[in-house]
A protein has these predicted regions:
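A short, small-residue-rich loop immediately preceding and capping a beta-strand
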Residues: 1, 16-23
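Short glycine-/polar-rich loops that comprise or flank the Walker A/P-loop
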Residues: 16-18, 45-47, 73
Length: 220
């Protein structure tokens, strides 16, 4: 919360180099005084977000996330939750990448947020939202898995997907949309909505995806 003012402005200026901001949320307040959901910060900042479902995915997201951030020229928010942050697991490591060379912005004014510059930069950020959605639709962290029973479709976000699979060790009979990268992938979301009678949303925290889903459906 204390860093949100700077964070919002980083989204408007953009970044020159990779930047991942990791937020450790605490659903159910196991070791803090509130259970704020940091996904709302990423949403109002209009930037991409990661939400890993397990330790391997957390490693993979950080490994590829710096390159993704540098390619977009925007910071990436990565949301962790208590049960993932307070656990440990072996992960498959990847080869170390060489450090990219230093480069400088062609227009240094993008980092000077006087109102005239900020308005221009904000228009640039707004114009890139479809690009961010397309990146989510093509992301390996968002996966649609079909199932024979179309009475229910499940959207499982972050560690919620891990919880779901623990209850279906032999595979889930319902179609499942796993969410690990935001903004929500519209193509896969509509595929699930059009295929199923009802939708269940599994998310650890506040109803972030549920509210967006109601917006898509025009209810609530």
């Amino acid at each position: 919360s204390a860093a949100s003012d700077v964070y919002k402005r980083q989204a408007i200026t953009g970044v020159k180099g990779g930047l991942i901001v990791i937020a450790a949320d605490d659903p159910s307040m196991h070791s803090s005084q509130n259970e704020q959901d940091s996904r709302f910060y990423g949403d109002f900042s209009l930037i991409p977000m990661y939400e890993p479902s397990n330790q391997q995915e957390a490693y993979d997201m950080v490994y590829s996330g710096f390159e993704f951030s540098e390619k977009l020229g925007e910071p990436i928010l990565m949301r962790m939750v208590t049960r993932l942050a307070h656990s440990r697991s072996g992960v498959e490591r990847k080869a170390q990448k060489p450090q990219n060379g230093i480069s400088f912005s062609e227009d240094p004014r993008q980092f000077i947020l006087l109102p005239g510059n900020a308005r221009k930069r904000y228009k640039v950020l707004l114009a890139r939202q479809d690009e961010f959605i397309k990146a989510s639709e093509e992301s390996p962290y968002n996966k649609y898995t079909d199932g024979p029973n179309k009475k229910l479709g499940i959207i499982a976000c972050g560690i919620g997907y891990n919880y779901l699979m623990e209850n279906y060790p032999e595979g889930c009979e319902y179609p499942v949309l796993k969410i690990g990268q935001y903004p929500l992938p519209k193509k896969q979301l509509h595929q699930l909505i059009d295929s199923c009678d009802e939708i269940l949303v599994l998310e650890d925290g506040q109803p972030f995806v549920e509210k967006q889903l109601k917006g898509y459906l025009g209810i609530g």
